[in-house]
């Protein structure tokens, strides 16, 4: 099924023409939803008045599937921490299920409750992370519990109830906007013209067909043992054959990274946010098992003997951070004037 969807959205399959009428219906529903929300919002209060709450940056995308939002969120959090600011993060928590919300991500988080991406963000940065299906509720809890200077939403571009002061869209340079159609005929959650109203577009990788303000490169760091504290250099597995496990939006990107590192991979792709059982990553051989950091947060409890994850970091030009900082300074200036 996944392969068929890939062909329709990113290949030349003619199924898109049969699905096109459903895309128009989808667009109609989106338009009605936005109109109704605008009416409701005019008479409702949002989580924290813009004049008193910290600036909110939404990092999202227009397409379904992985584009590189979470690495960019981590990079922004680390940037603000280096500046001495106190950032906080809100997230939907895809892949996690809790009896009650909002959920505060704490020490040794359970990805089955918080979701894999919030757990990863907290484990990498240590900053406050709050999860709720309704991100506005997560925001309110974050503001009630922490004195944050800036809030970042991991995804949420289409979550209309979430206030925002800056929108950053991430696009996978390899996939772009697919066939340019909205769901279900294409991968778009909103038409490409939505980019006209966002602040910044960041391309994850280089591609001539993607027009972006800035380019982000995901740089491999070190291999770290999934169940333990051991580390190895980025080229440690060069020349090896290994099982490659990935439950991310675009597993092909991870597999391509392994090929660049001269690793011959036996590929095992799972749906995004897949909840692993230990048997999923136990193979009848002695080959190492390699995975992404997002997968590793869900596998730490398995006590795997020879499983490793690749830590990656988002590398961006300093001009990107200068643009973000300038926007925050502008917001603070307006707040003082108000």
Curated annotation (Swiss-Prot):
The keyword Kinase applies. Pathway: Glycolipid biosynthesis; lipid IV(A) biosynthesis; lipid IV(A) from (3R)-3-hydroxytetradecanoyl-[acyl-carrier-protein] and UDP-N-acetyl-alpha-D-glucosamine: step 6/6. It comes from the Bacteria. GO terms for molecular function: ATP binding; tetraacyldisaccharide 4'-kinase activity. GO terms for cellular component: plasma membrane. This is Tetraacyldisaccharide 4'-kinase. ATP binds at residues 63-70. One of its GO terms (biological process) is lipopolysaccharide core region biosynthetic process. Belongs to the LpxK family. Keywords: ATP-binding, Kinase, Lipid A biosynthesis, Lipid biosynthesis, Lipid metabolism, Nucleotide-binding, Transferase. It comes from Hahella chejuensis (strain KCTC 2396). Transfers the gamma-phosphate of ATP to the 4'-position of a tetraacyldisaccharide 1-phosphate intermediate (termed DS-1-P) to form tetraacyldisaccharide 1,4'-bis-phosphate (lipid IVA). InterPro entries: LpxK, P-loop_NTPase. The keyword Zinc-finger does not apply. Pfam families: LpxK. It catalyses: a lipid A disaccharide + ATP = a lipid IVA + ADP + H(+). Its EC number is 2.7.1.130.
